[in-house]
Amino acid sequence: MQSSEGSPDMMDQKYNSVRLSPAASSRILYHVPCKVCRDHSSGKHYGIYACDGCAGFFKRSIRRSRQYVCKSQKQGLCVVDKTHRNQCRACRLRKCFEVGMNKDAVQHERGPRNSTLRRHMAMYKDAMMGAAEMPQIPPEILMNTAALTGFPGLPMPMPGVQRSHHHAALSAAFQPPPSAAVLDLSVPRVPHHPVHQGHHGFFSPTAAYMNALATRALPPTPPLMAAEHIKETAAEHLFKNVNWIKSVRAFTELPMPDQLLLLEESWKEFFILAMAQYLMPMNFAQLLFVYESENANREIVTIVAREVHAFQDVLNQLCHLNIDSTEYECLRAISLFRKSPPAASSTEDLANSSILTGSGSPNSSASAESRGLLESSKVAAMHNDARNALHNYISRTHPNQPLRFQTLLGVVTLMHKVSSFTIEELFFRKTIGDITIVRLISDMYSQRKI
């Protein structure tokens, strides 16, 4: 297998463009050389300026307690530079120590400092798990997302203008409302069509939260993201979704049991909508490869790989419909104020069986039916308000698409068929362990700390 150190750039066949690996990203300090091999550094690693290649080599060597032997006739005198750094591991490690790399920094490393899920998991664990090394992904997986047998390719990329609109939508959709009665949620360059609130005001997030979130807009998504970055961004969106829900005044006025129940039932749809709006396209082949390498249960791996098809189908439809930010907001409201709990998918039934989880934990949808909503009529009214807002907006902005409203509602129904178990396994299982996403976001919502 060819090392990725010598070829940071890879050609993505699907998009016919160069995809930069993490080593070729904007983190590279072209004016500061690596003290080990003199390649471009990417910042300080273990006490010195070093490139990702040497930093990764040092980390692996220390964590695995490697004892290398120099095979050269001139013991310990091998050249360690960008060209020859992989030829003698013993001399490379020796030079790492000579230039000042600190092995204690590796031993006490606590994983990515900006890990969203790890920050929130601190509520449940006194010590956070160390960041395990990402398995080396074969080039054929990186370059061809259809490499898995029978696995479909990625969704077609959005046109350039539409993609820029999607990235701009994050900040545009979260601007403070211009007035108490009208909120403009249109994307850039779309004619101004203000969305009027229903009498319940579900489009009324608090101004303080909107101002704070507007200053934390995510950077544009690259054409293809590495699996680790996808998971991190997915976690960020998961908790941003919860914060968005907390900012909806009509929702927070419901009894707390109703809020928690609706949150538990809608987190999956919110996650799918966020992934479609802000994180397309995705390399599912990378995600599955990493998941398979980390999971010894072949039965679960097989089920997750099969269920990813449904997830991708929904993302494909959402992508191809060119949904703007206002429509996304309406779809979120429709998903949030659901009149009845969605039916569990077959995979979720399996996930709740002792075969997969070792426990017979009840399905959240089943418990929803037994508990019911305390303010069911109010929730139903807000659901109707959201549907009417979407219908009225589409009538004004897409008069030549009479079926668009029903098509979008159909996608909402299709989202119900995506397995929340698969999403949890693929994006979050390694980090959250045995704790369910439902419990995690519900506890955080209740404590009002995210």
UniProtKB/Swiss-Prot annotation:
Residues 31-108 bind DNA. CDD domains: NR_DBD_TLX. This is Protein tailless. Monomer. Its main location: nucleus. It is found in: Nucleus. Signal peptide: none annotated. PROSITE patterns: NR_LBD (PS51843), NUCLEAR_REC_DBD_1 (PS00031), NUCLEAR_REC_DBD_2 (PS51030). The gene is tll.
